[in-house]
């Protein structure tokens, strides 16, 4: 509290605004990463506040994913800390099952985010040694500005906070429908239409597959090399198999084995216009964070001619698209499966821990979860949900050790006496 009074002395305007002192960390983001961190803090008896700009938890999953989506990895690699998936869930839970799991998770660990609070800025105040997090919350008729003052700030907005919209010559004048993959729900409304899917990652492949299954005519733009792996080999998860092999074999050998297995299951995909990178799939993931595509049926559709693979785009002209090889295609609709990016640079006023791309600078050193001055990041290590869970455990232990020492509380305490958040309004 001494720091709080020092902050008030040097900024008299605080008394004229709604200001909340948080007796614990502020977590920005109520997706899986933020929920995992909150749950681990709960187990450490550390109070917290979770700020979420949307009106629900896991808004990316609830509002910006397609209907057919399932987890790409087996559920044991996607569960959050302290709570496994229900035993009756399939190995690859559906979108709806994963959302149900997250909602149950939030209930179990008493996580009640402050919804519709969009963080405008967050900066560390050197004088007080505290973080100042300014938010704007909007209702139907009012707009409220709040400033949260805290000792610790956990950035949990993740790798996929904002859609990436490519700049393509003539796209703005295209006469058909253009949507980002985050607005795509089902191929049902595209039946019989010629749809150009821009992007060939997991989203691009699955959107193309879904379109083909709904009798659309998808063409998928593939500009660069990529690794496509079967999701399973002989009934076993390819990812799980890779993780087991890495315990015993060097990475280069694991990559060679995976490529042989992929060729055995999928055949030579390069003859369909899908060129593989020189770097192996696991090495590419480790070095550049580029995730291999896990095939769930798209390659078979490509082989049958149900999905057309095309090279890069040169320009749009009316309802036509000209490709870099000179070919022209008639197109009714365009789906931009061009990915997402971090939005951290837009609101976090800090450039020592985070780089301009919105990722921690120290990710490659396996220390991308902790910065200075009480700043933490969860879910930025490009290791999926399992990586976010590992970050969450480390962050909670780091903050919890300081909290327990300073408050001299026992590690465990009855749930009934646990205080989620101690706040004072000024």
From Swiss-Prot:
The UniProt record lists the keyword Disulfide bond = no
> Catalyses which reaction?
indole-3-pyruvate + NADPH + O2 + H(+) = (indol-3-yl)acetate + CO2 + NADP(+) + H2O
Q: What induces it?
A: Up-regulated by high temperature via activation by PIF4. Positively regulated by STY1 and during the day by REV1.
Coiled-coil stretches noted in the UniProt entry, renumbered to this chain: none
Stored InterPro entries:
Auxin_biosynth/cation_transpt, FAD/NAD-bd_sf, Flavin_mOase-like
Q: Where does NADP(+) bind?
A: 199-204
**Residue positions binding FAD:** 29-34
Give UniProt keywords alphabetically. Answer: Auxin biosynthesis, FAD, Flavoprotein, Monooxygenase, NADP, Oxidoreductase
Q: Report if keyword Acetylation is assigned.
A: no
Q: What class of enzyme is it?
A: oxidoreductase
What the record says about family reads:
Belongs to the FMO family.
Name assigned to this protein: Probable indole-3-pyruvate monooxygenase YUCCA8
Q: Which organism is it from?
A: Arabidopsis thaliana (Mouse-ear cress)
The organism's lineage? Eukaryota, Viridiplantae, Streptophyta, Embryophyta, Tracheophyta
């Amino acid at each position: 509290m001494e720091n709080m009074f020092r902050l008030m002395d040097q900024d008299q305007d605080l008394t004229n605004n709604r200001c909340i002192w948080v007796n614990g960390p502020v977590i920005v983001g109520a997706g899986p990463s933020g929920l995992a961190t909150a749950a681990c803090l709960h187990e450490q008896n550390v109070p917290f506040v979770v700020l979420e700009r949307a009106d629900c938890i896991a808004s990316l999953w609830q509002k910006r994913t397609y209907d057919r989506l399932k987890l790409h990895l087996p559920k044991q690699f996607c569960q959050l800390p302290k709570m496994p998936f229900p035993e009756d869930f399939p190995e690859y839970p559906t979108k709806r099952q994963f959302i149900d799991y997250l909602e149950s998770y939030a209930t179990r660990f008493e996580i009640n985010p402050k919804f519709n609070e969009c963080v405008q800025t967050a900066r560390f105040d050197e004088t007080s040694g505290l973080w100042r997090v300014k938010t704007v919350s909007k209702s139907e008729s009012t707009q409220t500005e709040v400033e949260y003052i805290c000792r610790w700030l956990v950035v949990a907005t993740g790798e996929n906070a904002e859609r990436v919209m490519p700049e393509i010559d003539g796209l703005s004048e295209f006469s058909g429908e253009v949507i980002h993959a985050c607005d795509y729900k089902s191929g049902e409304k595209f039946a019989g239409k010629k749809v150009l899917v821009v992007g060939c990652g997991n989203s691009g492949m699955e959107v193309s597959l879904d379109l083909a299954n709904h009798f659309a005519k998808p063409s998928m733009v593939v500009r660069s090399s990529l690794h496509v792996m079967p999701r399973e080999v002989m009934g076993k998860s390819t990812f799980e198999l890779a993780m087991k092999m890495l315990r015993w074999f060097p990475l280069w050998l694991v990559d060679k084995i995976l490529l042989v297995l992929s060729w055995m299951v999928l055949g030579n995909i390069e003859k369909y216009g899908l060129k593989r990178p020189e770097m192996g799939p696991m090495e590419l993931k480790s070095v550049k964070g580029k995730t291999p595509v896990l095939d769930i049926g798209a390659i078979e559709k490509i082989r049958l001619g149900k999905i057309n693979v095309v090279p890069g785009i040169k320009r749009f002209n009316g309802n036509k698209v000209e490709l870099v090889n000179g070919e022209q295609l008639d197109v009714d609709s365009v789906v931009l499966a061009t990915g997402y990016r971090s939005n951290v640079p837009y609101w976090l006023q800090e450039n020592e821990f985070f780089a301009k791309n919105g990722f921690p600078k120290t990710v490659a050193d396996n220390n991308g979860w902790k910065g200075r001055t009480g700043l933490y990041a969860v879910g930025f290590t490009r290791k999926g949900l399992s990586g976010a869970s590992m970050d969450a455990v480390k962050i909670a232990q780091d903050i919890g050790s300081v909290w327990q020492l300073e408050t001299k509380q026992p590690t465990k305490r009855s749930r009934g006496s646990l205080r989620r958040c101690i706040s004072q309004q000024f």
